[in-house]
């Protein structure tokens, strides 16, 4: 008498559909040289947890994976979130590294922005500690659409409308966002399959639906109206962000080329006032933005930049003006002997 044997339960990696695996694999293949170490920033929520599952499924040979978790104590359930991340790491056979941070008040930032800054600083610290140069982030199409709407409502410029980039660098760490073209519904479907398979459940962040926070207000109040009137609007807005990114890159290329004609000197700290005045008003502004960014100066508001532009236009033809001392974020712009300088 023969007996049947039950098929083994699929692993978490087997549960991950191709639609979620492929973008991660493509992002990793594009890295040159290929990384030996990789990390996923995991909060304990569904998005980042499922990105960890996808990364484990497509991890290249010779590459090790870690999960980075930032515990900032803003929520009463923060300890539970950390425990959930450790549980996920155990299921995937991946080490979990945790950084505890405190979000200080009074930095001139809202709580959302302050927490985000603390999170990036903590991730950079973990990356240095473990020799990791590439961190995967789980931002998806819905996040991208919300970001575009928020920046539009805040009056952002062309670069801001490009929203989140698939690859960006900050504090010496490369951040990859392979899911910017993935709808969150696919991620939640995988989270449901993982829960059914092994019982692991993603945590719920109450601030995600608290309309006191700007992003949550867009998500809970504006997005449902757009869903009802324009189904699929997130994909349209995400496409707009890609187009804005291309346009911003073209503008940046023109600004770099223009600045090279301004006789830059002293590692780009100074340029010719007369040559700058030969540019159109729009290109003058872009050249100034490029210059300030190249000197690691925070970008001024549009009004502040316009004031600098006005003062430079009105200087004596030879550029001798001891009264020009345009101060911004601890830096000083001055003009001497026909050249514009920036000092610490």
From Swiss-Prot:
The lineage of its organism: Bacteria, Pseudomonadati, Pseudomonadota, Betaproteobacteria, Burkholderiales. Keywords: ATP-binding, Cytoplasm, Ligase, Nucleotide-binding, tRNA processing. Pfam families: ATP_bind_3, TilS. It catalyses: cytidine(34) in tRNA(Ile2) + L-lysine + ATP = lysidine(34) in tRNA(Ile2) + AMP + diphosphate + H(+). Belongs to the tRNA(Ile)-lysidine synthase family. ATP binds at residues 43-48. One of its GO terms (biological process) is tRNA modification. It is found in: Cytoplasm. Signal peptide: none annotated. HAMAP family: tRNA_Ile_lys_synt. The N-terminal region contains the highly conserved SGGXDS motif, predicted to be a P-loop motif involved in ATP binding. This is tRNA(Ile)-lysidine synthase. Ligates lysine onto the cytidine present at position 34 of the AUA codon-specific tRNA(Ile) that contains the anticodon CAU, in an ATP-dependent manner. Cytidine is converted to lysidine, thus changing the amino acid specificity of the tRNA from methionine to isoleucine. The keyword Nuclease does not apply. GO terms for molecular function: ATP binding; tRNA(Ile)-lysidine synthase activity. Its EC number is 6.3.4.19. The gene is tilS. GO terms for cellular component: cytoplasm. Its main location: cytoplasm. InterPro entries: Rossmann-like_a/b/a_fold, TilS/TtcA_N, tRNA_Ile_lys_synt, tRNA_Ile_lys_synt_N, tRNA_Ile_lys_synt_subst-bd.
